[in-house]
Amino acid sequence: MSAPHLLVGNIFFAPYTYGGATIVAEEVARHLALDHGWQVSAVSAVSRADLPAYALRKVQTGPVPNYLINLPPGRSYAAHYSNPQVTETVSRLLHSLAPDLLHLHCLQELGSGLIRAGREAGVPVVVSTHDFWWLCERQFMIRPDGRYCGQSPVRIEGCRGCVVDHDRARTRARHLARALAEADLVTYPSAFARDLSRASGLGARADAVWQNGVTLPGPDFADRQAARRARDPRLTFGFCGGPSQLKGWPLIREAFAPLTRQDFRVWLVDGALEGSWWQDVPLKSLPGDWQVRPRYSQGDMDAFWAEIDVLLFPSQWKETFGLTVREALARGVRVIQTDSGGTVEHAGPDRDRLIPVGAGAEALRREILHALDRADRHAEPVPVTGFAAQAEALVRLSAPLIEPRGVWPEDLSQENALPRDMAPLAPISPRARELVEEIAPARQRAHRA
């Protein structure tokens, strides 16, 4: 059998990299291409005024070509979850590329019609969920007041206080449930996400927990970490969540404020695309040495984590996975965290010290003081799934879908060829400002609200 051809679908893809799910999609695709010899293509979205609406353009960074669909502004509510024009464009792409497998990640803005496009093209479809988009119009089960929804199971009748138009939200929920049921395989990043989705009525022909990978530490990380600790032995806390109630910032501020000691540092990661999350947040009155640091990339994260001894993760909602938690554990960084859904499904230390979601600042303060005073300040690294292992797991999961197809066609007919006017896209800013402003406000709100 020839190496399979995989078409990956995600709202973002390199060079428009944004969010943890995009990193997962890109890294798994890269490892499938480099480690397993798969041919991998991607389809994603862009929003540019200099291109016609729904124009298809191709750009490539690394081993994976990315076919970009230009989404125009002013799309309807329904087009955000089911867009016939996007579906038709992807159908043409499927007939032209003739992949052996369609792997769909985050489909907000692209729409669930990609599942139907795969089915009609005779291509097996795997859908990998990363958040609660299939259950929640607001994507993260965050209420308008910035608090976690808490429904378990999720029932559309319980969404009346959150959505603007309950009838259209009900239509959306029914449409997405029917669409997802047509997938050959649905994967979830945690047992928590799978169980909540099942209980809430989402089903598929098959489902599985497919745990996300992370970028593992480099071979010199332990030396870099030891050198930093020798240079500055103060315990350093790190917080990557932004100044939002949902991520626990008010609890952190309240927990540290009454401390009378100064023998620690706190690094706050700034993930803003423009400006700063922290520019209007007063920090000078807090005890200890507080610094705001720029967000790290996959390539330079070891430099950041070498400075951190304890990750603060007081999330006030039930998340599906928690990439940051795994990045920390893989590097011997302790984690102070709440019992926040899929983020706790790991083998890290201190699992008996999880803080209940909704507990006050005093509970977090006790854990901070325990971290400062404990004799065993530094933990050993914990085995964590990397992207190579995650790609290997996908190979195993998808084998029953791909193997019956045999050799995929190498000669494409003129009838199915892509349009001749689909020239390579001109250079694109990797910041992807227009696209993020148009498509990803919900994730930014989760960190700032």
Where are these predicted regions, by residue range?
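A charged, aromatic-enriched C-terminal amphipathic alpha-helix characteristic of glycosyltransferases
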Residues: 373-424
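Nucleotide-activated donor-binding/catalytic signature segment of Leloir-type glycosyltransferases, i.e.
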Residues: 278-299
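Conserved donor-binding/catalytic core segment of Leloir-type glycosyltransferases
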Residues: 7, 187, 228-247, 253-256
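Conserved acidic donor-binding segment of nucleotide-sugar-dependent glycosyltransferases
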Residues: 349, 353-362, 369-375
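A short, active-site helix/loop in glycosyltransferases that binds the activated sugar's phosphate group
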Residues: 163-206, 216
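Glycosyltransferase donor-sugar binding loop
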Residues: 240, 265-279
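Short hydrophobic beta-strand element within catalytic cores of glycosyltransferases
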Residues: 310, 334-337
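N-terminal subdomain of nucleotide-sugar transferases
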Residues: 1-55, 121, 257-260
